[in-house]
Structures are given as C-alpha cells and as structure tokens.
Amino acid sequence: MHFSVRLSLLLTLASSLPLVSAIPQHEDQAYTFPSPGRSATANTDPVLEVGRETQRTPSAWTRLRDSLVESVWGLPQRKEGGEWRTRNQVTTASRAPATLQARYGEDVVLRFTIKTQEEVKALVEASNILFLDVWGSHDDWVDIRLSRDVIPSLLGLLPPSLQSSHVPLIRDLAQTIYESYPKTNPSSPSQQGPTTRRFSPSASTSKTKPQETKNIFFQDYQPLSVLLPWMRLLVSMFSSHATLISVGTTAEGRDIPALRVGVHPTNNAQQAPRRRTIVISGGAHAREWISVSTVSYIAYSFITGYGKSRSITKLLEQFDYVFIPTVNPDGYAYTFSTDRLWRKNRQQTSLSFCPGIDLDHSWGYEWDGNATRSNPCSENYAGDQPFEAIEAREIATWARKEVTVNNVQFVAFVDLHSYSQQILYPYGHSCAHLPANLENLEELGAGLAKAIRKTSRENYDVKAACRGIVASSMGDKDADEAVTSSALESTAGSALDWFYHDMDVRFSYQIKLRDRGSYGFLLPREQIVPTGKEIYRAMVAMGKFLVSPHILTGDLNGPHAAEETQNYDDDFEEDEAEEDSDVFRAQGDDMSS
C-alpha cells in the first residue's frame, strides 16, 4: 500500500476514535501480565469481592484502530523491563491465543465446601440453571468456573450455608491460562525445526548426571505438531520393541496415534501365545493436558527402559503396552489454537454453534444421554445415542478387532484424567452394581496409591468411580444414600465401565492426576515430570501385580500360587534401586541427541 494511502487511512481512523489503548484499563493502569514467577492463583483471601470494578474488553473499533496503527507504523505501546513492545509482541513469550483475554478475562474459579446432601442438590440445580462449568469435585468440595458478573446470580440460588462457604481458587483465570501455554523461546522444542529439536531420545547407555542435561520434551506441554514427530522419532530409534499404530480416525480426519510396546518371541516355528495387553490412554478431555504428557512420559520410560531395567524388560516380555497419549486429537489441537479450556471433541452436533461430544460419556455400556440430549452446548453432552462420538466408536472398533482378529487379551485399562488425585475403579454409572473382582480391584488400587506415595509422597484416594463427593466424609450409614458425583458430572457411558464390562478387562481404572485444585486443569509445567514419575511407578507396580499367572486366571489358591507370586515379588524388589538410579535418570533428564 502506498505511503499516502496508508497515511490517509490512519488519519481517518484516528479522527473518528478516541485515543485510548486497546489494552484493558483497570484503576488507571494498563493491564499487564505479571512476571513469569508470579502466580495467578490465590488462596489467602477468604471471600471474593463480588462487586468490585472489573476490566473491560476493548471495543472492536478500538482493537481495529490499534491494530492498524501497529501494522502501519510498528509503534511500540509500552516499555517492559527496558524493552519496547507492541501489543502483538506482549504475548511472544507464550503460544497463547490472541482471544484469551476476551474469552476469559472476567472469569474466576470458586471452591465451594459441601457438608450435606441438600447443599449438593442446591449446587447441582444452580449449576444447571446457569450452565456453569463444574471443574472438579472431591469428598467435600466442588470447583466451579464462572464469570464475575454471574457470582451474585449463583449465590442468590444457593442456601445461606453455601453463600458463605466458598473461596476464590483462581482469581485471574486468563493469566493462569496464559502461563500454562508453552513458551516460544528459541530453545523451546515447538520453535525448533525437525533437524534441530533437542528432544530426540538418547540411545546411549551412559549414565549422565541429572544436572548435566535436561529432558526438553517434558519441560513443557507439547502441541500435537510436536507430539506426533516425537512419537515417530521414538519408534525409529527403538524399532525392536516399539511400533507406531493408529487406533482410529477423528471427526476432523486425524489419526488417533498410539505406541505399541512389547517384545515378541523370535522363534517363528513356535506358535505365539495369546498376547496379554495393557492399554494406557489420556486426553479424552482436551483441556487435561497433564494426562497427555503423563502417557507420553510413561511410554518413553518403558521404551527406553527396555534392556536397562530388569523390571521393564520383564514386563515387556510378558505384556504388550498400548499407549494412546490423546484419544481426542482434534480437541487437543483446538486447546492450543483457540480455547485452552475446551473439553469435548470437535464433532458437529444438531446445533452448529455448539460442536462437540464428551468422549467419556459416549461409550455404549450404560449410556445415558437423556440428561444432556436436548443441550448440545453442555460440557457433558453425550450425544443422541451411544457411540455417537466418532473417536469413542473408532477405539471400540479397534479394541474388538484386536481381540477377535489379532489374538489379543486385554488385561488392564488405565484412563488418565485430571484433576483431584483419585484412583477410581468400576462402576461409574451406579454404586448399586459391584464388580465381580472388587477385592482385587481394591487391592491393586491400594498398591498403585502406595507406589505413588513412595515416589513423591503424594496421596491418591482409591474408591469406586460412582462414589459421591460427600460420601466418604459422612458415616458409612449415610454413604450409601449420599448424592453421587453423577449429579454434578455424569459418569454413565464411560470408557472405564465399557472396557470392564463389555471387553471383560478385569483391571480397569480411571486415574485423576494432580493436583487437588490449586491449579485444576492448568497444572504448571514444572509438575509434568514429577507427575510422570509417580504414575510411571504406579504402572510398574501394576505390571508387578499382574505378571503373576494366578492373578489373571483367578486361581489364587493353587498349590504353587503363593510361592510363584513371592518369586515375582522378590525379582521386582531387587530391581527397584537399579530402576531409580538408571531409568528415572533417563526419563527426567536426558533426551538430547
């Protein structure tokens, strides 16, 4: 565009609009993101100031005017840390979408303390009326995301006991979201080319000291564009026992990638036995990034641990592992490009402006979509019929084919979610139905929690997925009558129940990862590796439990059962010290080529 034309356009716009900044103003100060070290969460003040003045999103004309000023003249808007930056450059330290402030600038997360069934019912009704986003729930609390201007309406629908029993968990949601996005500095994996990325798995057996190198891939949350090349690279370097497969196709046509890891007999003359397989998946809910990183971390640990750790080597000789980092690639990609808190898949529904089906409510066993059928805009929308969500249907088809065609026996299924630090076993749809092997499920669940506690001192609760948010805090008599968690978030039609019941996977679990609510779905990147380590240790404990031939056959009272189980236990106990010194060093520190 000619200079005179640009100048004319600029003067015309300048004369028609007041000279105010497009950056939201608050208390006579321009809105600025805090320094990277500052946290946006706050748990100190007991009551959120509901009526205080809030930041205003600039008008469309103002944003257009400022954009033209910057694009034509490249003018700086303010000085930060001695360096001039334009509005567009303010977010260059992060991959956060430009619409972040407009979408979540007025939102907060409140935690309500729940003591009675009546309070639960009141909160459920109010949440449904106002279409609120229930983030999570536990024994005696519920976290809800909402706009500041909706808080008075919510409190007005609640009994007096709840009106004063809430605290602000996240005061500045937009800032906390901003901090969760990967940093875009030159050393970040997402900013490096395929030939320069320093996250390639090391095939070296050298024992590098932890402080000498850092595992760059797990130092941040990685988008799909980085995750997929990383998976291909991992397989190319460990092709003897790792394979990249697709377990289906998404609504938008993407593959659902998975890593199959295991060591098969090399004697072709020997008929291969039925292959026992463990599935570990994550990312069913797109915004739960930590589940994607954790599945990737466990997969990397098993793949690189083969031949180095006797425990991992034994497990990969006994089982195949199928790691599915994200069963919802479309939604996961959307959280990076557009909306960090998107939950569902990206499938079209009967309402064009409300796409998406909740993948973990779309499975065929005990599907119940009646509660959300009329509202595709619901975060828990389960579709109009079972398996309407394409990704759930595709994975179910893959699983059935593995059993009927490929001679696979699924022995365990672990579905990673966030948050609240819970280990859940079937059933989720109803507490009236008890699993046939309840005692074994509880025993292994307790073992997983113990392994986590020994690794990181973090406590994970073990319970049935149907247990209510107030059940465990009330007496046993009241627990059976307590309002179930499905009142706040339906657990019918889950992958957990489907794999257990329809696929006869005797050891099925849903694990809700860190934390207990300080950050919710926006867990800081610094907790990726610690979370990965503790769940990796839990998966090793699961393998140790399942490797005994008497566990899966159910013959726990055979003449040699106790003796053989003890032999397996002794072998794994001898390996623990070696694992901690060798494999953990590789997992958390060295991934550079």
Curated annotation (Swiss-Prot):
GO terms for molecular function: zinc ion binding. This is Inactive metallocarboxypeptidase ECM14. It comes from Arthroderma gypseum (strain ATCC MYA-4604 / CBS 118893). SUPFAM superfamilies: Zn-dependent exopeptidases. Its cofactor is Zn(2+). Residues 220-546 form the Peptidase M14 domain. SMART domains: Zn_pept. It comes from the Eukaryota. Residues 1-22 form the signal peptide. Zn(2+) binds at H285, E288, H417. CDD domains: M14_CP_A-B_like. Keywords: Cell wall biogenesis/degradation, Disulfide bond, Glycoprotein, Metal-binding, Secreted, Signal, Vacuole, Zinc. Its main location: other. Binds 1 zinc ion per subunit. Belongs to the peptidase M14 family. Residues 182-210 have a biased composition (Polar residues).
